[in-house]
Amino acid sequence: MSKLFLSIDFEDFSHDLGRDLGLWETRPLRIAALTRAYEAIERFLQAHGGARATFFCTGIIAEQAPELIARIAAEGHEIACHHHFHDCIDQETPEAFAANLQKALSALRAASGQPVTGFRAPKFRIPQSRSAHYTLLAKHVEYDSSYLCNSAEAARHFSASLAPPLKILPIFAARPRALAPKMRLGGTYLKLFSRATAARLIKASTQAGLAPHIYLHPYEFVADQSFALSRAELAPLGPARAAYWHARQSQWHKIGNRSLPQKLSALLQNHTLGGRLDENLTPLAL
Ligand SMILES: [Zn+2]
């Protein structure tokens, strides 16, 4: 059976959405909800052979809940970096990016007691046409998993353009059929796909020379809306924007969450979980 890789972008959605919307710069994280979501992920992995996985964690979690990062590392998972805050790197100067990256890496290394060698940009947004951000990244980590593409050739071409070199672990993104919108192998896309569409994308990834690799988030493994912002928290946005964001959150916290574990289990009937990314750089990195 071929391998299917699973990685988690480990972030507190409620904290990060409020920051994106300008409601706060930072505030206490929902550590109990993060812990419950981690435990749901761990139960899923244990029920499917006990493979270990890679958790791309925001630095703020390591700052506020170092014991949770230590536990994830102690249970055998790879701790990788998902920036300090969940900010869009394409909106940051190289200097701001460098400062946030170093802050995140030092918090994650201290909390996990592990080397932290992998990185994924929040929302996969990191400038790919300008080299400054990747040059900085290559000084601090061994691999990046922020590149979306539909062929191994595209990933190799991008990887070859980087100096200093950095290993690229791409995420497959393509149209499941002609004229359909481009979809990624993970997140909301995976929740909304039918099982057949997900299986088709996994097959297409393999045919394109890319080891199938699904990314998911803690809030997708729970269906209790524990990462949703309340109407009261959204109220400072004004009635119209608050109502919009309150409704919009269903996309992340409600629609398809209950059926996700069964869908993943069904996909795993034809695959085995691939394990930590840092232990599989040879099949994955281009
Ligand atoms: Zn993220």
Where do the protein language model's features map onto the residues?
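Surface-exposed cleft-lining segments at the edges of enzyme active sites
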Residues: 181-192, 251
